[in-house]
Amino acid sequence: MIAFRAVWSALLASLLLLLLAPSASPVDAFSPPEASLTGGQSLSKRSLFDPSCTGVFDRQLLRRLGRVCDDCFNVFREPNVATECRSNCYNNPVFRQCMAYVVPAHLHNEHREAVQMVGK
Protein backbone atom coordinates (compact mmCIF):
# COMPACT_ATOMS: atom_id res chain seq x y z
CA MET A 1 0.00 0.00 0.00
CA ILE A 2 2.86 2.38 0.79
CA ALA A 3 4.50 1.61 -2.58
CA PHE A 4 1.21 2.35 -4.35
CA ARG A 5 0.97 5.75 -2.65
CA ALA A 6 4.58 6.57 -3.56
CA VAL A 7 3.99 5.68 -7.21
CA TRP A 8 0.70 7.59 -7.20
CA SER A 9 2.37 10.66 -5.68
CA ALA A 10 5.18 10.53 -8.23
CA LEU A 11 2.65 10.25 -11.06
CA LEU A 12 0.66 13.22 -9.79
CA ALA A 13 3.82 15.28 -9.35
CA SER A 14 4.94 14.56 -12.91
CA LEU A 15 1.50 15.46 -14.28
CA LEU A 16 1.58 18.69 -12.32
CA LEU A 17 4.99 19.53 -13.81
CA LEU A 18 3.66 18.86 -17.31
CA LEU A 19 0.71 21.17 -16.71
CA LEU A 20 2.89 23.96 -15.33
CA ALA A 21 5.40 23.82 -18.20
CA PRO A 22 3.38 23.21 -21.40
CA SER A 23 5.96 24.87 -23.65
CA ALA A 24 8.75 22.45 -22.82
CA SER A 25 8.52 19.05 -24.43
CA PRO A 26 10.18 15.96 -22.94
CA VAL A 27 12.23 15.52 -26.13
CA ASP A 28 13.73 19.01 -25.77
CA ALA A 29 14.85 18.29 -22.23
CA PHE A 30 17.02 15.36 -23.29
CA SER A 31 18.20 16.44 -26.73
CA PRO A 32 21.38 18.46 -27.20
CA PRO A 33 20.94 22.15 -28.09
CA GLU A 34 22.30 21.65 -31.59
CA ALA A 35 19.57 19.12 -32.41
CA SER A 36 16.83 21.51 -33.40
CA LEU A 37 14.17 21.67 -36.07
CA THR A 38 16.63 23.48 -38.31
CA GLY A 39 18.84 20.41 -38.56
CA GLY A 40 21.68 21.94 -36.58
CA GLN A 41 21.76 25.18 -38.57
CA SER A 42 22.02 28.32 -36.51
CA LEU A 43 19.44 31.01 -37.00
CA SER A 44 20.55 34.59 -37.29
CA LYS A 45 18.75 37.26 -35.32
CA ARG A 46 17.21 38.71 -38.47
CA SER A 47 15.72 35.37 -39.52
CA LEU A 48 13.26 35.61 -36.64
CA PHE A 49 11.74 38.70 -38.22
CA ASP A 50 10.58 39.79 -41.64
CA PRO A 51 13.51 39.53 -44.08
CA SER A 52 12.31 42.70 -45.81
CA CYS A 53 13.47 44.62 -42.72
CA THR A 54 16.99 45.36 -43.89
CA GLY A 55 17.60 48.48 -41.84
CA VAL A 56 18.67 48.80 -38.22
CA PHE A 57 18.01 45.63 -36.23
CA ASP A 58 16.48 46.96 -33.03
CA ARG A 59 14.37 44.50 -31.06
CA GLN A 60 12.62 47.28 -29.17
CA LEU A 61 11.54 49.06 -32.36
CA LEU A 62 10.44 45.80 -33.97
CA ARG A 63 8.45 44.89 -30.85
CA ARG A 64 6.79 48.32 -30.82
CA LEU A 65 5.81 48.07 -34.49
CA GLY A 66 4.67 44.47 -34.07
CA ARG A 67 2.55 45.52 -31.10
CA VAL A 68 0.65 47.97 -33.34
CA CYS A 69 -0.21 45.07 -35.67
CA ASP A 70 -1.14 42.80 -32.75
CA ASP A 71 -3.42 45.45 -31.25
CA CYS A 72 -5.00 46.10 -34.63
CA PHE A 73 -5.64 42.38 -35.10
CA ASN A 74 -7.19 42.19 -31.62
CA VAL A 75 -9.54 45.05 -32.51
CA PHE A 76 -10.64 43.86 -35.95
CA ARG A 77 -10.11 40.07 -35.67
CA GLU A 78 -9.42 39.79 -39.39
CA PRO A 79 -6.75 37.17 -40.22
CA ASN A 80 -5.31 39.21 -43.09
CA VAL A 81 -4.72 42.23 -40.84
CA ALA A 82 -1.99 40.45 -38.88
CA THR A 83 -0.01 39.46 -41.98
CA GLU A 84 -0.62 42.49 -44.18
CA CYS A 85 0.23 44.91 -41.38
CA ARG A 86 3.75 43.44 -41.15
CA SER A 87 4.33 43.16 -44.90
CA ASN A 88 7.09 45.21 -46.55
CA CYS A 89 8.61 45.78 -43.11
CA TYR A 90 5.57 47.73 -41.85
CA ASN A 91 5.74 50.19 -44.75
CA ASN A 92 2.24 49.65 -46.11
CA PRO A 93 -1.26 51.18 -46.00
CA VAL A 94 -2.61 48.58 -43.55
CA PHE A 95 0.04 49.47 -40.96
CA ARG A 96 -0.68 53.18 -41.42
CA GLN A 97 -4.42 52.58 -40.93
CA CYS A 98 -3.74 50.45 -37.86
CA MET A 99 -1.41 53.12 -36.49
CA ALA A 100 -4.09 55.77 -36.98
CA TYR A 101 -6.59 53.59 -35.14
CA VAL A 102 -4.61 52.21 -32.18
CA VAL A 103 -1.74 54.68 -31.61
CA PRO A 104 -2.30 58.10 -30.05
CA ALA A 105 -1.74 60.92 -32.56
CA HIS A 106 1.21 62.41 -30.68
CA LEU A 107 3.15 59.14 -31.21
CA HIS A 108 2.57 58.81 -34.97
CA ASN A 109 5.82 60.52 -35.98
CA GLU A 110 7.77 58.30 -33.60
CA HIS A 111 6.27 55.19 -35.23
CA ARG A 112 6.89 56.53 -38.75
CA GLU A 113 10.55 57.09 -37.87
CA ALA A 114 10.77 53.56 -36.46
CA VAL A 115 9.40 52.15 -39.74
CA GLN A 116 12.03 54.12 -41.64
CA MET A 117 14.83 52.89 -39.37
CA VAL A 118 14.04 49.17 -39.57
CA GLY A 119 13.07 49.21 -43.24
CA LYS A 120 16.03 50.93 -44.88
From Swiss-Prot:
Subcellular location: Secreted
Main location: secreted
Signal sequence extent: 1-24
A GO-annotated cellular component: extracellular region
Protein name: Crustacean hyperglycemic hormones 1
GO MF annotations in UniProt: neuropeptide hormone activity
InterPro entries: Crust_neurhormone_CS (IPR018251), Crust_neurohorm (IPR031098), Crust_neurohorm_sf (IPR035957), Hyperglycemic (IPR001166), Hyperglycemic1 (IPR000346)
Protein source organism: Penaeus japonicus
UniProt keyword terms in alphabetical order: Amidation, Carbohydrate metabolism, Cleavage on pair of basic residues, Disulfide bond, Glucose metabolism, Hormone, Neuropeptide, Secreted, Signal
Alphabetical list of PANTHER family matching this protein: ION TRANSPORT PEPTIDE, ISOFORM C
Swiss-Prot/TrEMBL GO biological process terms: circadian rhythm; glucose metabolic process; neuropeptide signaling pathway
Disulfide-bonded cysteines: 53-89, 69-85, 72-98
